[in-house]
């Protein structure tokens, strides 16, 4: 079974998260997509609780699976103590699915800081990495890729053009300031946020 791993705080999940997952399902040879909800140690005042973030991640998975069941939520990072590191999550995935190939899905911003990740070279040795980048960022990414020393195989990193710019931070700000936001998140998540007054003065 071929696995893909997509991690994040999902505070909240939004349409770019959904589009990325659907894109990965269509373009990559994967059988299961694991959505891992990470710890949020730098929690802001208007960040949602772990329980809410987990519930919204489940709604994201339902949106993904509406057109073909492939995704599931992992709460392992939330249930362990301490900060979240991708290398530790990969170790856990390897315990659950020994010998199964894993593809790590990341956005362009994360790739720019990839060399600051804990054990980043080991990550490249243990899984494939797919970077979703903006179409106009080719030169910058080619340069960043060229300066990653110690890559065991140049084919371990693949780039996919993905022109869908959204951030959870911007959505939280929009909600807090009373701006429209429902068009930025899947409908089920918009309903969840509204019914629980998340990220607003009433939360």
UniProtKB/Swiss-Prot annotation:
Pathway: Cofactor biosynthesis; NAD(+) biosynthesis; deamido-NAD(+) from nicotinate D-ribonucleotide: step 1/1. One of its GO terms (molecular function) is ATP binding. GO terms for biological process: NAD biosynthetic process. Keywords: ATP-binding, NAD, Nucleotide-binding, Nucleotidyltransferase, Pyridine nucleotide biosynthesis, Transferase. Its EC number is 2.7.7.18. It catalyses: nicotinate beta-D-ribonucleotide + ATP + H(+) = deamido-NAD(+) + diphosphate. It holds the Pfam family CTP_transf_like. The keyword Glycosyltransferase does not apply. Catalyzes the reversible adenylation of nicotinate mononucleotide (NaMN) to nicotinic acid adenine dinucleotide (NaAD). Belongs to the NadD family. This is Probable nicotinate-nucleotide adenylyltransferase. It comes from Prosthecochloris aestuarii (strain DSM 271 / SK 413). The gene is nadD.
């Amino acid at each position: 079974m071929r696995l893909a791993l997509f991690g994040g705080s999902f505070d909240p999940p939004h349409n770019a998260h959904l589009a990325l997952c659907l894109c990965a399902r269509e373009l990559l040879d994967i059988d299961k997509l694991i959505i891992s909800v990470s710890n949020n140690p730098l929690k802001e005042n208007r960040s949602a609780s772990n329980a809410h973030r987990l519930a919204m991640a489940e709604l994201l998975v339902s949106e993904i699976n509406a057109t073909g069941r492939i995704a599931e939520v992992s709460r392992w990072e939330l249930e362990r103590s301490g900060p979240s590191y991708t290398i530790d999550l990969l170790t856990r995935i390897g315990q659950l699915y020994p010998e199964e190939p894993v593809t790590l899905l990341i956005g362009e911003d994360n790739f720019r800081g990839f060399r600051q990740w804990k054990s980043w070279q080991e990550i490249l040795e243990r899984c494939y990495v797919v970077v979703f980048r903006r179409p106009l960022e080719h030169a910058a990414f080619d340069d960043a890729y060229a300066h990653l020393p110690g890559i065991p195989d140049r084919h371990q990193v693949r780039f996919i053009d993905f022109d869908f710019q959204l951030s959870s931070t911007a959505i939280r700000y929009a909600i807090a300031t009373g701006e429209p936001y429902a068009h930025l998140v899947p409908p089920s998540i918009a309903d969840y946020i509204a019914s629980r007054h998340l990220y607003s003065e009433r939360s």
